[in-house]
């Protein structure tokens, strides 16, 4: 049976419902339309979302590109500014270097001119001497001929007589000429030496430090004083025994004074006491522990200070023990001048002067840096600091030139090389130029008082005034009891007393004043 026959039978049968069939057909059509519409709507929504996503992506890409462009422009501007700064710095350095070169060229030109003038003067003097010698020879020949004609003396006797006569006549002139040449040469050398020293001094500047023998430690409260002292004073006794300092506790609010002439001990005590106060546990066991830590910190600080000084001067090849001992000079002072700073300054001055006179600046710099290293050695070694320092650096492989320069910088031994003289000169410049060193106020007042007292102890002195920071003393004597000759003797006597009994850094000018005043009143 075919499908058409089957459909016909169904349609003819009573079971077939046309309304249901039509409904199914309409429902299927509507379902198809709904599915088609939904699919179309879905596709349209997908297209719209895709377009929106594409637009968002395009905008984000544009924003990212703009950010990248701005960042690149900022980096370019920063690089350009950095290059401009570097260019400006290099231009300034080039200008400074050019000025230095021009100044050096001017100095060389001046030296060339001075040498030319000296050579011309020498040539003129040589020509004058030759002319004088020729004139003397001609005169001698003429006199000899005349004498041979009128005398029975032989030629040798006449020659000897003429030689003695001419020698007597020319001796004074030659001596005066020699003195003039030597004075001019000495003056030129002094002028050049003064120029070199002034140029070296102007390139460095130093400031005095405070030469203290005590250190103040602040306390958080007054109760801490009792904890530092401890029961029956056991804590403070243990602290003083471990550090070797004196701890002074008085009525000063919230302060403790640490006193010691050894700056390293004083610094160790300060660090240990501050650590104990911060920790809060103060008893003999912790005191020993914190003092040991403070010693280690001081050793590290000294090593770092030595390395900084060596790096600053660009010196290579120093033994670590030398660097360590050199760093300890950081804690020592001489007339308010830090010894490590003084050593660095001496090294720089010696290097500059060596460069000016054509010597090796590195050798001079090395010797200048190490010249006072003996001051950092403890008191177990005997001898002056120059001798101790020379032996110490010899032990660690320094060259004989440097060793002799250190040993001879106070002229305790004979300088063997010119570098020893350079170190002496640089050390003197660093120590005595204005502002480099200064006495403590108490020592300054005491020295002025002793100076005036020495003058007042001489018979006939009425008043004495120390002026110019102790570099000059003016003595007023009684004109009734002191004559002019006695005033001169008083000046000499006071000079001898000052040299024998007083220590002073430079020179002291002595002025004795003897004057009489006569007053009349007209009525």
From Swiss-Prot:
Location of this chain's protein in the cell: Cell membrane
Keyword list, A-Z: Cell membrane, Endonuclease, Hydrolase, Membrane, Nuclease, RNA-binding, Transmembrane, Transmembrane helix
Domain KH per the UniProt entry, residue ranges: 213-276
Single GO term (MF): RNA binding
HD domain mapped to chain residues: 339-432
GO biological process, one term: mRNA catabolic process
Primary location class: membrane
Matching Gene3D superfamilies: Hypothetical protein af1432, K Homology domain, type 1
Lineage: Bacteria, Pseudomonadati, Verrucomicrobiota, Opitutia, Opitutales
InterPro entries per the UniProt record, alphabetical: HD/PDEase_dom, HD_domain, HDIG_dom, KH_dom, KH_dom_type_1, KH_dom_type_1_sf, Ribonuclease_Y, RNase_Y_N
Annotated source species: Opitutus terrae (strain DSM 11246 / JCM 15787 / PB90-1)
Annotated membrane topology: Single-pass membrane protein
GO CC, alphabetical: plasma membrane
Its biological purpose: Endoribonuclease that initiates mRNA decay.
Membrane-crossing segments per the record: 18-38
Protein name listed in UniProt: Ribonuclease Y
The protein's Enzyme Commission number: 3.1.-.-
Similarity section: Belongs to the RNase Y family.
